[in-house]
């Protein structure tokens, strides 16, 4: 199958996919300055990056920073580099074939395998949504005094926001997401400046150490960070939304589109690296440095920030960034859920039904755990959701790497051998870390 055939053959399938009318809806200039083409492709990478700084990251980063200082910064860096490689492969698949990852699985695997992969991916989305419900509910409580249980229920109405944005076009959706990302960036930039962490200690934290693997608690948090950073549904999402660009569906056009799409996602994920590292650095500089190694809950961190930093604004900025993170994650998770369901099952539900169904499943355990165990229970549930996400990663990564290394499917954009080897190493690292976690859990 040639590259042209690979991309054109599935057009009918893609037309009924998760993008609907948004496919090839964003124009791309064929001439002019390079920055005009870069701006045209700017967007999908930032939507994907939302998943790399959602409320689930906050819990694992806060726990890691307060308990182990700057030690786990190396894990954040590693997971971010892994994300850059995997998201680049995801964009490559979508641009080369015109299929998203879910559609490629449906085309290549037996029905039973597809149903299993779909079920696993839906569990990942629910785990992600669980983190968003908890994070947004906590932010509403911190800012407005709304009880956690009520805040969790209120999050169900976010479907209205998603529908309004989608009706205004894909660029409006991207602009909204980027605006909230800038708010998060500004909030943490100010907080880091207030905390004034020691530069040498921060830089030293990016150097990997054996303690990350030998200490079971550090490993548990490390896997949680990887699960919170490299999210399974993001691989499905990215392979779909890169197709919103109206680039020429030719070999030359696809190669150019891939270059700009990878640039977009790489820059966006470096942005996410700053946010994730900032959360951990803040916890290490403010809590760990003063002997508070027990800070694992977002509410606890919020309460301690102002008195320990001596600036009341710090806690408010923390809560505002958390709310922006929760809202942003809602938008992208809704889109990812639609893409996954339609790609695997060819089942198209109205977005509001799809969103209420997923959010309803996520709200129930939050309400029950909050009622039975209080706020401490929701904090543990938040970290657990990120470990669950990490356990499901191989089921998205392995099919992706197999597809992008298949010349018959990918044509001229087949991934080079060196890139495939790196991707398999990443897949092996994820699998080994998960097996180590299961072993330690069984022993303890």
Swiss-Prot record:
UniProt record similarity statement: Belongs to the NRAMP family.
The protein's name in its UniProt record: Divalent metal cation transporter MntH
Sample GO molecular function, one term: symporter activity
Membrane-traversing stretches: 38-58, 68-88, 115-135, 146-166, 175-195, 218-238, 267-287, 303-323, 356-376, 381-401, 413-433
Predominant location category: membrane
Bilayer topology term: Multi-pass membrane protein
Source organism, top-level taxon: Bacteria
KW Cell membrane (keyword) present: yes
Cited function: H(+)-stimulated, divalent metal cation uptake system.
Localization per record: Cell inner membrane
Extent of the signal sequence: none
One Gene Ontology CC term in the entry: plasma membrane
InterPro entries: NRAMP_fam
Keywords: Cell inner membrane, Cell membrane, Ion transport, Membrane, Symport, Transmembrane, Transmembrane helix, Transport
GO biological process: iron ion transmembrane transport
Keyword Transport found: yes
């Amino acid at each position: 199958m040639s590259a042209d055939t690979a991309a054109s053959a599935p057009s009918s399938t893609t037309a009924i996919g998760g993008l609907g009318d948004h496919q090839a809806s964003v124009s791309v200039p064929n001439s002019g300055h390079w920055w005009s083409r870069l701006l045209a492709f700017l967007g999908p990478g930032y939507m994907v990056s939302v998943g790399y700084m959602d409320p689930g990251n906050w819990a694992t980063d806060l726990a890691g920073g307060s308990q182990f200082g700057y030690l786990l910064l190396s894990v954040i860096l590693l997971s971010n580099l892994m994300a850059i490689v995997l998201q680049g492969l995801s964009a490559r698949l979508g641009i080369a074939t015109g299929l998203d990852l879910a559609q490629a699985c449906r085309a290549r695997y037996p029905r039973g395998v597809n149903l299993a992969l779909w079920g696993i991916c839906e569990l990942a989305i629910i785990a992600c949504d669980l983190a968003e419900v908890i994070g947004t509910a906590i932010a509403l409580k911190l800012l407005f005094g709304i009880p956690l249980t009520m805040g969790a229920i209120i999050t169900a109405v976010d479907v209205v926001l998603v529908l309004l944005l989608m009706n205004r076009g894909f660029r409006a959706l991207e602009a909204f997401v980027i605006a909230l990302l800038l708010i998060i960036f500004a909030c943490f930039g100010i907080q880091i400046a207030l905390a004034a962490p020691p530069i040498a200690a921060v830089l030293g934290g990016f150097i990997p150490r054996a303690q990350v693997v030998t200490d079971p608690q550090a490993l548990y948090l490390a896997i949680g960070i990887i699960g919170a950073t490299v999210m399974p549904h993001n691989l499905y999402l990215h392979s779909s939304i890169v197709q919103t660009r109206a680039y020429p569906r030719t070999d030359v056009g696809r190669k150019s589109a891939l270059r700009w799409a990878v640039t977009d996602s790489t820059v966006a994920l470096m942005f996410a690296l700053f946010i994730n590292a900032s959360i951990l650095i803040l916890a290490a500089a403010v809590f760990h440095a003063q002997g508070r190694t027990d800070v694992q809950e977002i509410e606890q961190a919020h309460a301690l920030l102002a008195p320990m930093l001596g600036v009341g604004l710090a806690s408010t900025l923390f809560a505002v960034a958390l709310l922006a993170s929760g809202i942003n994650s809602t938008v992208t998770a809704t889109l990812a859920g639609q893409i996954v369901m339609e790609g695997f099952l060819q089942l198209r539900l109205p977005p509001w039904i799809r969103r209420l169904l997923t959010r309803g499943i996520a709200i129930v355990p939050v309400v029950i755990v909050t009622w039975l165990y209080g706020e401490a229970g929701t904090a543990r549930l938040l970290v657990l959701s990120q470990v669950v996400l990490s356990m499901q990663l191989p089921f998205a990564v392995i099919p992706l790497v197999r597809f992008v290394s298949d010349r018959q499917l990918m044509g001229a954009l087949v991934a080079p051998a060196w890139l495939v080897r790196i991707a398999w190493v990443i897949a092996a690292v994820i699998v080994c870390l998960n097996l180590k976690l299961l072993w330690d859990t069984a022993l303890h």
